[in-house]
C-alpha cells in the first residue's frame, strides 16, 4: 500500500492512500474479485481537534451499527493489572465487589480465562472456559457480577492464534503467511487469515458458543 501528500503547481494539496500503483499487481481470473481494506478520511480547516470531532461524528452517525453509539460508555475495570494470568473466579469476584462499592459500572475479565492460558505461550484460538479457574462456570460468574449491579465483559483476541494451541495444530494453514517464507511470531502468536471463510466461521462459532 501507499499513502502520501502531494502539492501541484497551483498550490493544491492532494492526499491519497491505497494500492501502490508502482509495485502492486494481482492477476484476476474471469469472475474473480479483489477486496481491499477501506480507507476513511476526513478534512478540517480548523485544526486537529475539529478533525477528531469530525471523525467521531462520521463514525457515530453513519458507520457504527451498535446500539451503544449514542449512549454513554460505562465506567469499567478489568483485572489485568491486578492479576495478569494468576486468577480464579474467587479473586475476580473480590475485585468486582470492591469495584462495585466504588460505583464502577462494568467488570471485564481479561486474558487467561480459557484453555491452559497461564502465560502468553499458548492457547490463543481455543476459546474454551478453563473450569479450574472459572469455578462453577462462566454463567455463575456473570450472574454473581450482575447481582452487584454491574455489567460483565470478556476479553477476546479473535484474530490471533498460538502455535501451542489445538487450532494451530489442526489448521496451521489458517495463519497469515507468505508462501515459501517462515512465519513471524510476535508474543508467541500468529495472525489468523480472516480472508478465509472457514477461519471466520470458526472464530465466530467458537466465540458465540462462549457467549450463548
State where each predicted segment sits.
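Acidic/aromatic-lined carbohydrate-recognition and catalytic surfaces
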Residues: 114-169
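Generic structural signal for well-ordered alpha-helices
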Residues: 92-97, 138-142, 207-208
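Active-site-adjacent "subsite" loops/lids of carbohydrate-active enzymes
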Residues: 72-74, 81-85, 158-212
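Long, charged amphipathic helices and adjacent flexible linkers at domain junctions
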Residues: 55-75
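Catalytic domains of carbohydrate-active enzymes, especially glycoside hydrolases
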Residues: 91-114
